[in-house]
Design a protein with these regions (language model features):
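N-terminal small/polar loop signature for handling phosphorylated ligands or for N-terminal nucleophile
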Residues: 32-67
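Gly/Ser/Thr-rich loops at beta-strand to alpha-helix junctions
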Residues: 11-17, 61-63, 77-79, 107-112, ...
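Internal, active-site/partner-interface "lid" segment
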Residues: 97-155
Length: 252
């Protein structure tokens, strides 16, 4: 397959997606970037799709049939066993990742534990996490609301930490609470569990994953979440009420 015919479609922005875009542009690849958020859909790029070129969709939900020549790049949900997206793109193009790109890959693949495992320094971890939050669009107000959420809305059930978030940007909360074994963060329109046996928990909700109402990633002990605005508040409350006893009774 001719690498020069690839047309890259960028998904929701975070530090990894920014890094992918930078790497592609440095290598003079054709990139389409609509600066989408998490949960980005292939249909956003309908205006560029055709049956001649090979399109590479990066972390895009396939809400429409993909074009005739299409490569899907992702490492979430059913693709959670794969390398990070930036690593997959590097392999596709025969590019060797530098230290910064390796840190970005580890962060996106397995959060802080994966960076620690690859030998990242505390300063490198702090830098990557700050840049990732910024790339996600987290504002100073979000950071302050995260602190307020922890200060005023944190509770525990056995070894489970539960936070009622005042900001939809949950990573501003997770970064402040790390290290943790089991963390559940929720708001009026979304919910995410981080920690022990997250992939196994996701397995109990596969019908929601298949309907794109839920997602998971980050390995066995990564995360499982309900997509923002994917269900009614009372439905979300029911899932939270089901999750808490499950999570508090997890065995190691």
């Amino acid at each position: 397959m001719n690498r020069n015919r690839y047309r890259f479609l960028l998904g929701g922005h975070d530090l990894e997606m920014n890094g992918i875009g930078k790497m592609l542009r440095q290598n003079r690849k054709i990139v389409y970037d609509l600066h989408l958020s998490w949960g980005a859909r292939l249909s956003s790029y309908t205006y560029v799709l055709n049956s001649e070129d090979t399109f590479v969709g990066i972390e895009l939900t396939e809400d429409i049939p993909p074009p005739a020549h299409y490569i899907a790049i992702d490492h979430h949900n059913e693709n959670s066993h794969k390398a990070s997206s930036i690593e997959q793109i590097a392999e596709l193009l025969g590019i060797k990742l530098n230290r910064e790109q390796q840190l970005i890959a580890a962060n996106d693949r397995g959060y802080i534990p994966a960076m620690i495992e690859m030998g990242a320094t505390p300063d490198e971890i702090t830098d990557i996490r700050c840049r990732d939050r910024e790339a996600q669009g987290i504002t100073e107000e979000d950071e302050l609301l995260a602190e307020q959420s922890i200060r005023e809305n944190l509770s525990t059930e056995k070894d489970l930490i539960i936070v009622n978030a005042l900001t939809p940007r949950f990573s501003a909360i997770t970064d402040r609470l790390f290290p943790f074994e089991k963390l559940l963060i929720y708001s009026n329109d979304s919910l995410t569990y981080y920690g022990r046996q997250a992939k196994a928990i996701a397995g109990l909700f596969m019908p929601l994953v298949e309907k794109h109402k839920a997602y998971y990633g980050g390995g066995e002990n990564g995360f499982f979440g309900i997509a923002q605005n994917s269900m009614l508040p009372e439905e979300l409350q029911q899932i939270k009420n089901k999750l808490i006893p499950l999570l508090t009774n997890l065995t190691k």
